UniProtKB/Swiss-Prot annotation:
The species this protein was found in: Bordetella parapertussis (strain 12822 / ATCC BAA-587 / NCTC 13253)
Function: Catalyzes the transfer of a phosphate group to glutamate to form L-glutamate 5-phosphate.
EC number in record: 2.7.2.11
Annotated positions binding substrate: 60, 147, 159
Top-level division of the source organism's lineage: Bacteria
Domain spans labelled PUA: 286-364
MF-aspect GO terms: ATP binding; glutamate 5-kinase activity; RNA binding
CDD domains: AAK_G5K_ProB, PUA_G5K
Residues binding ATP: 20, 179-180, 221-227
Name of this protein: Glutamate 5-kinase
Record HAMAP family: ProB
Pathway: Amino-acid biosynthesis; L-proline biosynthesis; L-glutamate 5-semialdehyde from L-glutamate: step 1/2
One Gene Ontology cellular component annotation held by this UniProt entry: cytosol
């Protein structure tokens, strides 16, 4: 990590971008949409379009707009009330963006996604194809989580995560996360005035996760840690991430012109195939298996499949075909993938050689608990 910037922003060379705009940047401090702010973002994205760049906008603001329309001053905690606010507010959010982009001769499209949409392989591919078609048509997709139908168990959790997943979905060159903070600091600048600003780092650097923490404003849901984890996700498709203040004048167009603004997190992690990204990011974890040191080494350094003999413990309940995390003896995740046996059967065959599976279970569907083609090292 360094406080020095590179000479030119990575955004200048990016042809396909995902820009995530937080609630605080499109609302009047949570009291409904700020139409001037919406117009401002539309103008900047229109300028990027004129440069030949394709842009997908991930925008928060539906719940805040719904709260304003319903006369609620405090964000509700009950899921059904949040969903009601989202249903009311999404109408206003789409209308505002449609009107704003129309001033520049651009059409918009509403894309509402849930985790289940991306967890299902066919729906994942359909969403991908639809977004590519919209971009080819010169349409600006406005993406948000479908808050009206999601539950706590299937939520993305925040639009930073959604932005990263969309970045991977469309193979974008870069992700821009706009927030109400300048970028990343080595400590919370609101508590430590001497905190050093981080202008440049590598996405996936473990030190970043250790530094980050705390929630953002009371309007949205994402703190700085979620942004760092989003950058790590995006890096696995080769996309760079910039975390910058949306309060900076014309921040998007200036980044596109090569100006270095905010924190730039470069993608240096191994680029995963589309299938590996889907396995790692879009499927819900159903449990964990604790591995001994030998099994961890085999997965990380030898590219081997996971065998029952290397499993020390099973945590949680899962079925064959679910996504399960592989963790070491200290609880650190090293891989995840599709499991070939249920949690009940895995408990019966752990610490056993594969040659004993048929004797213990009565039959053997696979010699591996997790085949190397169906797992990804994390």
């Amino acid at each position: 990590m360094t406080a020095q910037t590179s000479a030119v922003s990575v955004i200048s060379a990016a042809n396909r971008l995902v820009a995530k705009v937080g609630s605080s940047l499109v609302t009047n401090e949570g009291r409904g949409l700020d139409r001037a702010a919406v117009d401002h973002w539309a103008a900047q994205i229109a300028a990027l379009h004129q440069q030949g760049k394709q842009v997908v906008l991930v925008s928060s603001g539906a719940i805040a707009e719904g709260m304003a329309r319903l006369g609620w001053r405090k964000r509700p905690s009950a899921m059904h009330e949040l969903q009601a606010a989202a249903a009311v507010g999404q109408m206003g959010l789409c209308q505002a963006y449609e009107a704003a982009f129309a001033e520049f001769g651009l059409r918009t499209a509403q894309i509402l996604l849930t985790h289940e949409d991306l967890a299902d392989r066919h729906r994942y591919l359909n969403a991908r194809s639809t977004l590519f078609a919209l971009l080819r048509l010169g349409v600006v997709p406005i993406v948000n989580e479908n808050d009206t139908v999601v539950t706590d168990e299937i939520r993305f959790g925040d639009n930073d995560t959604l932005g990263a997943l969309v970045t991977n979905l469309i193979e974008a060159d870069a992700l821009i996360i706009l927030t109400d903070q300048r970028g990343l600091y080595e400590a919370d600048p609101r508590c430590d005035p001497a905190a050093r600003f981080v202008a440049h780092a590598q996405a996936g650097d473990a030190a970043l996760e250790a530094m980050a923490g705390g929630a953002g404003s009371g309007v949205g849901t994402g703190g700085m840690l979620t942004k760092i984890l989003a950058a790590k996700r995006a890096a696995h498709s080769g996309a760079h991430t910039v975390i910058a203040s949306g309060r900076e004048r014309n921040v998007l167009t200036r980044l596109a012109q090569g100006e270095c603004i905010g924190t730039e997190l470069r993608a240096v992690l191994p680029v995963w195939s589309a299938r590996k990204q889907w396995l790692a990011d879009h499927l819900r974890l159903r449990g964990r298996v604790v591995l001994d040191d030998g099994a961890v080494h085999a997965l990380l350094h030898e590219g081997k499949s996971l065998l029952p003999i290397g499993v020390a413990e099973v945590q949680g309940e899962f079925e064959r075909g679910d996504v399960v995390a592989c963790v070491d003896m200290h609880g650190r995740e090293c891989a995840r993938g599709l499991i070939n046996y249920s949690s009940a059967d895995t408990r019966r065959i752990l610490r056993q050689p594969s040659s004993q599976i048929a004797r213990i279970l009565g039959s053997m569907t696979d010699p591996e608990l997790m085949h190397r083609d169906n797992l990804v090292v994390t």
